[in-house]
Amino acid sequence: MAGRSVRVPRRGSAGTQSRGQLAAGRDLLAREQEYKRLNEELEAKTADLVRQAEEVIREQQEVRARPFSALTTSCKEEGGSSSRDLLSSEGTHPWTETKPKTKNTGPVNKIQNRLHSADKERKTNSSAKLKYPDAQTANDVAIPDDFSDFSLAKTISRIEGQLDEDGLPECAEDDSFCGVSKDIGTEAQIRFLKAKLHVMQEELDSVVCECSKKEDKIQDLKSKVKNLEEDCVRQQRTVTSQQSQIEKYKNLFEEANKKCDELQQQLSSVERELESKRRLQKQAASSQSATEVRLNRALEEAEKYKVELSKLRQTNKDITNEDHQKIEVLKSENKKLERQKGELMIGFKKQLKLIDILKRQKMHIEAAKMLSFSEEEFMKALEWGSS
């Protein structure tokens, strides 16, 4: 019974530990999928921003390729009053090299607003990504095929080369650059796009570094989980072996009890036989006192009875000696059984102590995990407040 009471809580603790490990593994996988999705969105936003910059250059090249009459009509339609003021201030030669007196900064502001909105979305994704400390990144991120060879330095050099070769038109058809002079539009575009791309490159490098750190942490946690699973398997094996030993000792104890019962039955039968023989002796003594008349005739029979009585006494002595020996043997066996019983009780106590120690170790491990998580969240909250 004691072995069964020990075995049941041990299985429960192993089951709860395995369920906790499975739940932790599922949580890690869900976080990994979430971070992959956020990283894909970030890469898509970056690629979209680069495509927008390339579209601006392409539209400028298309506008430059148009004839002069189409350019003037498009500037008049899109520029409105600002283009008319620019033409009136320059007189009859609106397309000369002289700079206008009033500078139109509307298209530059449009580009800045567009890039600023994209940057806001990207920062929102990166902040949502930093909220979770345990994630797999860097090596497991799915990157689009057209973005594998992306380099901000190459993109900047390509844009600068196109601007140096083609230049900006005096009046472009695009809404973002219409009404801006050639020198101001080129400088503003190059300076703004260059700064924006450098900032994005730095943010991307910081995100990749953070992803690698998180991946190292996840690998450490996986190794810890693996070690815990191996410890659990070893503990289960030891428990099963101890349970088999307990069952074996139980069987031996039952067999010893059966043997003890059999010996007790034999002892009771011998005692009954001895009592019957004693009664016979009493009857013989009474018959001797009653048969004084027949004493002479019964002398021979008395002698015979004496011989038989001596034999019976001898046999009784032998039987009593054997009974004493059997009793001593039974006592020694009972002592052995009591000793085995004491050893079993000591083993049960040791197992209970081992179970308590394992429960405490489990509680310490869980407390250490909770403490580490709380410290990391506190440090991240401090960093977030300072930023």
UniProtKB/Swiss-Prot annotation:
It comes from the Eukaryota. Keywords: Coiled coil, Cytoplasm, Cytoskeleton. The gene is Tex9. Residues 184-347 form a coiled coil. SUPFAM superfamilies: Tropomyosin. Residues 1-25, 58-133 are annotated as: Disordered. This is Testis-expressed protein 9. Residues 70-91, 103-115 have a biased composition (Polar residues). Its main location: cytoplasm. One of its GO terms (cellular component) is centriolar satellite. It is found in: Cytoplasm, Cytoskeleton, Microtubule organizing center, Centrosome, Centriolar satellite. Gene3D superfamilies: 1.10.287.1490. The lineage of its organism: Eukaryota, Metazoa, Chordata, Craniata, Vertebrata.
